[in-house]
Amino acid sequence: AILELVPRVDENFAAAIRLILDCEGRVVITGMGKSGIIGRKMAATLASTGTPSFYLHPAEGIHGDLGMVTSGDVVIALSNSGETGEVLNILPSLRRIGAKLIAMVGNAASTLGKNADVVLDVGVSKEACPLGLAPTSSTTAALAYGDALALALLQKHNFTASQFAIFHPGGSLGRKLLLTVGSIMHKGEENPVVLGSTTVQEALFVITDKGLGAVSVVDEAGIMQGVLTDGDIRRGLSKGCLLYTSPSPRDISGS
């Protein structure tokens, strides 16, 4: 199904890209049933890759939600047959609003196709469903074509990983792209600090009080000299050293 679409990444595809790039508003995706589910995914992918977009349910649209559409928007309507009643019902209002229309259909000669500014033919020769009824190959083709649109727009917008991170701060992707040392470091009153002359017992009290498991050791000028961790103290105690009574740092050698 996807291979059938390769020759159709053509002048119509380019026209759709130009229409969206010239759009002063947002990309509105609409579709009913399985096409609507594909439309939701398309809207999410576009929005997360630099093209402001949202999904509009066509049945809700004719009951007031068309108010979300403006004359500066581009509407992408999905329908395999191109004759889905709920989608066709919103076309007159879209024209009155002044939004541009891209039809993503399996039949370019359909009513939806004839009313569109740009027609994207995503038709397939047959469905994977053995009954030839359930949308399978057709939805896969529409999804792939939608991803192609999103990625072409991403490149045209020179969209970067840093921009992607702003829109996707959650999950492992967000942590990978946004998490910095500054995000998790402790500073100011949150950072436990002791002088090099501090006894280990006193340092241990500071470690316990701050709950970080370590203290920064500085000199009289506040310049970092090293780090003392609770692990360092445990290892020192395991060697039988009287660290609690040590008035100053000492080198500890093995027996």
Identify the residue ranges that each predicted region occupies.
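The conserved cystathionine-beta-synthase
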Residues: 193-211, 237, 250
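Short, structural beta-strand-to-alpha-helix junction motif
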Residues: 179-185, 197-200, 242-246
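Single conserved hydrophobic/aromatic residue that forms the stacking wall/gate
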Residues: 241-255
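An N-terminal, well-structured beta->alpha segment
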Residues: 1-22
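Glycine-rich phosphate-binding loops that contact phosphosugars or nucleotide phosphates
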Residues: 25-144, 150-153
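Long, charged amphipathic helices and adjacent flexible linkers at domain junctions
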Residues: 163-186, 191
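A short, polar/charged loop-to-alpha-helix boundary motif
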Residues: 128-132, 233-243
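A glycine-centered beta-loop-beta connector
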Residues: 184, 207-210, 215-233, 246, ...
